[in-house]
């Protein structure tokens, strides 16, 4: 596990250096079926937060229900619905794999909520 966390950290740093984002969006930890899975997810989130902090990036967190609602229109959508809607929203040629769809869903959620709040500020 330490090697995978290091690989994640180094990969995130490369992405941050290349893409130069202003902020980072991540999913809040959902403690569901397995405490072990939640612990591993928490460790990965910690690495993402650390890499973001190193570059002074604001980290915004969204709950799974917020993400699903932003992508599908309802907070209790299933994974298949999220994957399909990501394909539609982003005009992809095929449905992305589960992990990629999850990451893209967080990005879509963040983008939608940012656009909404920007309009409210005007």
Model region roles, listed by residue range:
Residues 1-122:
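Phosphate- and other anionic-substrate recognition elements at nucleic-acid/protein interfaces
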